[in-house]
Amino acid sequence: MSSHVPNFDAGVPCPKTGQPLLPAIAQDATTGRVLMLAWMNREAWDETISGNRAVYFSRSRGKLWRKGDTSGHAQVVREIRVDCDADTILLSVEQTGAACHENYESCFFRRVDPDGTTHITEERIA
């Protein structure tokens, strides 16, 4: 295995298809803010590598999810990193619109206090 290729043999099996999936973290290329966590299969990886746009695998739909195809909220990939075990992918992206399907900039818009109280920490993008 090449050191720059993710190890899909170490992936988590997809509940619908059984194919191995690896977690893919999307991070804002300018601010470093974590935008979302999604999953990639080998086909999503290959499409992301060959283009400059983030492509994921939807576990609920059991198919490729080309970020922005329906919402227009695409992610242009600026850099790709793979962790030391080659089982997690980090995409540095230029985000158009909201990364979150609930129309927040980031999927991590909830803060949980030590007592369990939850707070919404940002406004929805119109």
From Swiss-Prot:
UniProt keyword annotations, A-Z: Amino-acid biosynthesis, Cytoplasm, Histidine biosynthesis, Hydrolase, Magnesium, Metal-binding, Zinc
Pfam families according to UniProt: PRA-CH
BP term (GO), one: L-histidine biosynthetic process
Protein name as it appears in the record: Phosphoribosyl-AMP cyclohydrolase
Binding site for Zn(2+): C84, C100, C107
GO terms for cellular component: cytoplasm
Catalytic reaction(s) noted: 1-(5-phospho-beta-D-ribosyl)-5'-AMP + H2O = 1-(5-phospho-beta-D-ribosyl)-5-[(5-phospho-beta-D-ribosylamino)methylideneamino]imidazole-4-carboxamide
Role according to the record: Catalyzes the hydrolysis of the adenine ring of phosphoribosyl-AMP.
